Design a protein with these regions (language model features):
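N-terminal pre-domain/capping segments
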Residues: 1-86
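Hydrophobic faces of well-ordered beta-strands that scaffold small-molecule active sites
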Residues: 2-10, 24-28, 58-62, 99-101, ...
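Acidic (Asp/Glu)-rich catalytic clusters
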Residues: 15-23, 40-60, 85-95, 127-131, ...
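Charged helix-capping and loop-helix junction motifs
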Residues: 40-46, 76-85, 113-123, 150, ...
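A short acidic, helix-capping loop that chelates divalent metal ions and anchors anionic groups
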Residues: 66-72, 106-111, 172-173, 200-204
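Active-site acidic/histidine proton-transfer and metal-coordination neighborhood
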Residues: 70-162
Length: 215
């Protein structure tokens, strides 16, 4: 993989320095927690500007806590739309070429068919309400099979909505090998998250430390 395709997550406070030294991009993860876009914005903004200084290639990871596009409660769905719109504006503010958002599947709350059907409705409405050129990459977390998110982006059929494959999440939550997910995602795959674990928990371990052969 070429350096031009690699990004370091700002979860690591040294990500910006390493990315500048190695010619890499950065994935801004500071807004995964929504309060960093609200009452903690000034502090977070200073940190993000320091991390991204001099780095042209940027991706922004949006918030995900308690956000479910397929929520049964209409107010919960409105909250997801509000936070995603906020993240879209942040991506534009920081010049991020892509916005990564979790699909929002929770197996103890939603049947897969409901999740897909209602997510399609949510994203069609969201994209219609937010015109312009941008790219949203839906990331797998607890989805057990690639068909779930794949069905969503196929049905929405908007080039602004594509997929982010998180191989560590696949290893923790799916019995289907990551390489098969990648093959099925095909032309809809726009971004990857690479980290490892022993399949028992989503530990976000370094690449050589886990059961995925990535050393």
């Amino acid at each position: 993989m070429e350096r031009s395709q690699l990004y370091l997550s700002t979860i690591d406070p040294e990500a910006g320095n390493i990315a500048r030294a190695q010619g890499l991009g950065v994935e801004i993860a500071d807004f995964c927690t929504a309060c960093n876009a609200d009452e903690l914005f000034d502090e977070t903004n200073r940190r993000v500007l320091a991390q991204t200084r001099g780095i042209a290639r940027r991706v922004l990871h949006g918030p995900f806590n308690e956000l479910f596009p397929c929520a049964i409660d209409p107010l919960a769905r409105k909250l997801a739309a509000y936070r995603y719109a906020q993240a879209l504006e942040l991506a534009r503010r920081y010049g991020a070429q892509k916005l990564v958002l979790h699909g929002g599947y929770c197996p103890r709350l939603y049947f897969p068919c409901w999740y897909v059907e209602q997510s399609v409705a949510f994203w069609r409405e969201f994209l219609a309400q937010h015109p312009g050129a941008y790219e949203i990459c839906l990331e797998n977390v607890m989805e057990e099979a690639p068909e779930m998110l794949l069905s969503i982006v196929r049905q929405v059929a908007d080039p602004r909505l594509c997929l982010c494959l998180d191989v560590g999440h696949v290893n923790s939550y799916s019995g289907i090998p990551a390489i098969e997910w990648m093959a099925q995602y095909g032309p809809w795959l726009s971004h990857l998250h690479l980290h490892n674990n022993d399949a028992s928990a989503d530990t976000h371990s370094p690449l050589p430390r886990g059961s995925l052969p990535m050393a």
